[in-house]
């Protein structure tokens, strides 16, 4: 088995090779990878089944098993995400801001790949394909370190990708999966500044905190999702029920799922029973404050810990408020900077929410579940950044590039 240093050397060399590939070559290779994923779906599902058997034997929660599971539909979605990338404009090589200085120098910026991108992730094997597609199209080599829970699935997907690249004359070293599941290797990976340009962690709060606190390699933080939907006093109640049901129950184990409902007391007695009725169709446990419990006897008491909790389960908290100010204050206190939504017909309250909520994605009258690179038109995303430097929100191709200055002269020297 290769050492991490050997993988780093290969990836660094491959990144220089990849930076020179033209758009047509990259798109042709991506099409071949997408075709290979669908053609090898049965073998990928067979590998995934091994992971599922182990996960169930180890008592993994249903929400996490859902994240781990691959079927024909999800494999086709992975392939479609890669195909979408072929239709997107390549940001690499874009030159902007060219200006002529008084001394005759022409100075501008050129968009270039980051180099080698390492992605550390947990139980979602689709990240293997998503991460490859975005890093490859943006001219970056990748080093992938998935969780031990999904190791068989990850190996199967990475092997299919590498073989498809090789069959099409592309250096397969542009994708490097770490097959050793020893957790100590993560700490080693985080210190590989000589080979890795940036690390992107995707997973639970513990993983992200460990990488952010201990990596000497620059990190783009993808945060956990304690996402809120605020039902304003001027909300369309039917719309609120529909949006909350979708945001909470369509997929509970994802970071853009709604974990907390905030509702104005002026509409709480009318809206809460209707919302609880809908959520109970999926057996969602509803935990609320005292006023929320007065509105519906099926609500159980919430603790202070509930307000900041990312459940990833069939549980939601309900906080009642007296004003939009209180709603904004509560959300900004407990959110994780991911995705927040207001349901309202009031223009001023909508704009206040957009302006004052501190999050990567802020919605008016829509589900938080749209916080996704594919839904935003970026193709498969590398993650949703909750930090403010370099990239924020769903990260597509441009987020995986940087710029350098290009300067054209005619023999000028500095006096």
Swiss-Prot record:
EC number: 1.2.1.41
TM stretches of this protein: none
Catalyzed chemical reaction(s): L-glutamate 5-semialdehyde + phosphate + NADP(+) = L-glutamyl 5-phosphate + NADPH + H(+)
Pfam family, one: Aldedh
First-listed, main subcellular location of the protein, grouped into a coarse class: cytoplasm
SUPFAM superfamilies with a match to the protein in the record: ALDH-like (SSF53720)
GO terms classed as biological process: L-proline biosynthetic process
One Gene Ontology molecular-function label: glutamate-5-semialdehyde dehydrogenase activity
The protein's annotated pathway: Amino-acid biosynthesis; L-proline biosynthesis; L-glutamate 5-semialdehyde from L-glutamate: step 2/2
Uppermost EC category: oxidoreductase
Keyword annotations from UniProtKB, A to Z: Amino-acid biosynthesis, Cytoplasm, NADP, Oxidoreductase, Proline biosynthesis
Role played: Catalyzes the NADPH-dependent reduction of L-glutamate 5-phosphate into L-glutamate 5-semialdehyde and phosphate. The product spontaneously undergoes cyclization to form 1-pyrroline-5-carboxylate.
Similarity-based family: Belongs to the gamma-glutamyl phosphate reductase family.
Protein name: Gamma-glutamyl phosphate reductase
Organism encoding this protein: Lachnospira eligens (strain ATCC 27750 / DSM 3376 / VPI C15-48 / C15-B4) (Eubacterium eligens)
